[in-house]
């Protein structure tokens, strides 16, 4: 048929990332604090894939005499959308097959493989309402206490906890 279909060009895009940060700190010699937040969005090179992140943190430091106490808290959130059709499906598509029919509609089936199994167009699979996303929230708290009875000797205790919740959703239209 003389078709020279560039299947690899279809799912790709020029991706842009952005990130914004804010950090405020202050206090005196006894008590110091820091509060920060950042957000970001990263596009994937595959159309339909991206990642959004948000993070907040609080740092508190208390120093009095021989004692020092530090607490760091972090909250984070990530939402990610994955491409609904793998790039490998586009890479495997035959360049002699057409993407669209004579009416301009996406071709559903490209043909059959050696075992007579249907080969579906990645463009058709891509046009379905497929979903592949995930959300993750996390909390981290690190606490440290230090005692310095003399300059050459110190005792330190560190405690930390981490909690992460992830939820994903995958739906592929038949």
Question: Which residue stretches match the model-derived regions?
Answer:
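Surface-exposed loop/interface segments of Gram-negative outer-membrane beta-barrel transport/assembly proteins
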Residues: 1-3, 44-49, 55-140, 156-174
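Outer-membrane beta-barrel architecture
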Residues: 23-25, 36, 58-59, 142-144, ...
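Short strand-turn segments of transmembrane beta-barrel domains in outer membranes
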Residues: 1-23, 33-46
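An active-site-proximal structural segment forming one wall of the substrate-binding cleft
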Residues: 153
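Outer-membrane beta-barrel channels and translocator barrels
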Residues: 17, 28-29, 63-67, 148-150
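Solvent-exposed, well-ordered amphipathic alpha-helical segments
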Residues: 1, 18-20, 26-28, 71, ...
């Amino acid at each position: 048929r003389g078709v020279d279909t560039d299947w690899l060009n279809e799912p790709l895009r020029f991706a842009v990332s952005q990130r914004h940060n804010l950090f405020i700190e202050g206090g005196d010699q006894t008590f110091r604090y820091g509060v920060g937040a950042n957000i970001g969005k990263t596009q994937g090179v595959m159309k339909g894939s991206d990642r959004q992140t948000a993070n907040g943190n609080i740092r508190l430091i208390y120093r009095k005499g021989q004692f020092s106490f530090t607490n760091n808290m972090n909250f984070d959130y990530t939402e990610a959308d994955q491409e609904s059709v793998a790039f490998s499906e586009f890479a495997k598509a035959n360049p002699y097959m057409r993407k669209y029919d004579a009416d301009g509609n996406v071709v559903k089936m490209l043909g059959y493989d050696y075992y007579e199994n249907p080969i579906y167009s990645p463009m058709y699979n891509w046009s379905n309402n497929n979903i592949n996303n995930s959300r993750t929230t996390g909390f981290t708290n690190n606490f440290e206490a230090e005692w310095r009875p003399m300059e050459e000797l110190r005792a330190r205790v560190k405690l930390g906890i981490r909690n992460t919740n992830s939820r994903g959703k995958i739906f592929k239209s038949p």
